């Protein structure tokens, strides 16, 4: 097949008018926060606060590694059995202890990112989390993941919604802009 054999539409045929059609906009934004790394939590919280500021009902569902930034910074060891305790020792929770997914450089990478953000007046993930609470963003920890990883409600920061499961998250996602980060 060559370019010459492709049938061309008649020149007089009008193009469909799409300018008159208004795009449908979702009134809800649901973000599944699966990663607990700094460079993933940052855009998660930027998008959540922006969505709420635009008037969208915004929900962030924190699951698996995404739960660890919700752990209080002063909590060092969580879990009931040795596997859960090892997990918490190797993946310290809290928004002050997050690593970068790339170029972590033994902790120097996050420090450089935070420094650059400060120079350019970019709110930190901690500040964005506080803004999200003030804007009414639903910050929902995954109950199943909490149970699996040995996290209790008192291990998590204040101001979160009640822990819930995937059924609730998927129900919230109906008709919403949905992101998985």
Where are each of the predicted segments found?
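Histidine-anchored nucleotide/phosphate-binding helix
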Residues: 42-55, 60
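A charged, amphipathic interaction segment
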Residues: 106-167, 171
């Amino acid at each position: 097949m060559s370019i010459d054999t492709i049938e061309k539409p008649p020149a007089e045929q009008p193009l469909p008018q799409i300018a008159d059609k208004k795009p449908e906009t979702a009134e809800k934004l649901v973000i599944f926060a699966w990663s607990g790394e700094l460079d993933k939590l940052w855009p998660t919280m930027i998008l959540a606060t922006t969505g709420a500021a635009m008037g969208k009902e915004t929900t962030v569902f924190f699951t698996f590694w995404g739960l660890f930034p919700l752990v209080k910074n002063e909590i060092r060891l969580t879990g009931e059995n040795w596997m859960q305790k090892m997990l918490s020792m190797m993946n310290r929770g809290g928004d002050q202890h997050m690593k970068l997914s790339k170029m972590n450089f033994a902790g120097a990478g996050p420090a450089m990112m935070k420094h650059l953000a400060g120079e350019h007046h970019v709110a930190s993930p901690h500040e964005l989390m506080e803004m999200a609470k003030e804007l009414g963003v639903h910050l929902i920890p995954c109950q199943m993941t909490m149970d699996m990883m040995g996290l209790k409600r008192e291990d998590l920061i204040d101001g979160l919604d009640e822990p819930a499961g995937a059924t609730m998250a998927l129900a919230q996602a109906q008709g919403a802009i949905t992101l998985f980060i």
